[in-house]
Design a protein with these regions (language model features):
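Terminal intrinsically disordered/low-complexity segments used for targeting and assembly
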Residues: 2-56, 111, 135, 219-265, ...
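Hydrophobic alpha-helical structural elements of bacterial secretion/transport assemblies
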Residues: 47, 51, 55-87, 104-112, ...
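Short strand-turn segments of transmembrane beta-barrel domains in outer membranes
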Residues: 90-92, 300
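Residues on the lipid-exposed face of transmembrane beta-strands in outer-membrane beta-barrel proteins
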Residues: 92, 115-119, 323-327
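Gram-negative outer-membrane beta-barrel proteins
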Residues: 94-100, 123-125, 305-309
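Long hydrophobic segments that form regular secondary structure
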Residues: 272-292
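Short, contiguous acidic/charged loop-to-helix segments that flank catalytic cores in large enzymes
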Residues: 308-316, 328-330
Length: 330
């Protein structure tokens, strides 16, 4: 009965018009929330090793995982009031009753060993809605970690391919420079033998200079991509080993796909936005339930005795039950 009574709206996912079918590349299908099978797409062993290091050491991803652990703890805390709490207490006290207040002027000892039970009757769904919001926040944190992982994999791959491209361009430029140096020497020899004028020699020098001036720019670009890649890996700046050219890199022939509705569910930004709506919807229920009286059932049961040696005797049994009502006024 209590489980079915909770004020506030229940979340309902809006209907979306989606096609029934969509092209799927065999062997690369994904399930909802599963980390993409990136090794099936990025097959370069060097790139795979970099991605694994990034997934382990990236600082932004580590922060997202910390927020996930925080959300897990918050859900545990939010669910705790849904169940009775049971504690054990033992103690003793000595009291002197004044004759001026009707006492007998004697000292009295009392020893107790009690079990303490407390349970809030969640009639209006205050605690259930709060746990519902915490569960949505936890799932949102899980999808945020997933989003960081997917984004990190893509960023590492992009930086790696940029680095491969720059290295390939630098290698090609160095070859071009070497070729033009040879061409300049030939032109100089031809000029010395009177076969050509100095104009052709000057043109060869200009051509060589144009090739040589590209090298510092390419080296600077390589340094930028290396530092960018190291930052993604959570490491200090240093050189990065890559494949020599794109011809050495094996690529997959297709990309993961699926039903359009599944694709939406796998998009972290869409899932995080929806879960934010779920949490906000549950918080509406929390706010509404907080307007109603809150009932708490408490009880104490155990033994009490004036003599410590008699504390566990059956005649010392004692209990008390209390129903408390609290009504917010403002």
């Amino acid at each position: 009965l209590l489980a079915g009574c909770a004020v506030g709206p229940d979340y309902e996912r809006p209907d979306l018009a989606m096609p029934d079918t969509h092209r799927v590349e065999p062997g690369l299908e994904l399930t909802t929330g599963e980390l993409p099978k990136w090794k099936a797409v990025f097959r370069d062993p060097l790139l795979q090793a970099l991605i694994e290091r990034g997934l382990e050491n990236n600082l932004d991803l580590a922060a997202a995982r910390s927020r996930l652990r925080e959300a897990e703890a918050e859900l545990t805390r939010a669910r705790a009031p849904l169940y009775p709490s049971l504690d054990v207490a033992a103690g003793g006290e000595r009291e002197y009753e004044s004759e001026l207040t009707g006492g007998d002027g004697e000292t009295a000892d009392t020893y107790s060993f009690l079990g303490l039970l407390s349970w809030e009757l969640d009639i209006w769904g205050f605690n259930r809605r709060r746990a519902e919001a915490a569960a949505a926040d936890l799932e949102s944190a899980q999808w945020s970690v997933y989003a960081r992982q997917v984004s990190l994999i893509g960023a590492i791959a992009a930086s790696y391919f940029n680095l491969v491209a720059v290295n390939e361009q630098l290698s090609l430029t160095n070859s071009t420079v070497a070729t033009r140096i040879q061409a300049l020497r030939i032109q100089e020899l031809r000029n010395q033998s009177g076969m050509i004028s100095g104009l052709e020699v000057a043109q060869a020098k200009v051509s060589l200079a144009e090739a040589e001036k590209q090298i510092p720019t390419l080296k600077n670009s390589r340094l930028v991509f290396e530092n960018q890649l190291r930052r993604l890996l959570g490491e200090m700046p240093a050189s990065v080993n890559t494949s020599r050219s794109f011809e050495d890199i094996p690529f997959a022939t297709g990309l993961p796909a699926g039903l359009p509705s599944d694709l939406l569910e796998r998009r972290p930004d869409v899932r995080v936005a929806e879960l934010g709506l779920v949490a906000a919807n549950a918080e509406v229920g929390v706010a509404k339930a907080d307007l109603f009286p809150r009932l708490t059932l408490t009880g104490e049961f155990g033994t009490e005795s004036a003599d410590l040696s008699d504390l566990l005797d059956s005649g010392g049994r004692a209990w008390v039950a209390t129903l408390g009502v609290a009504q917010p006024l403002f």
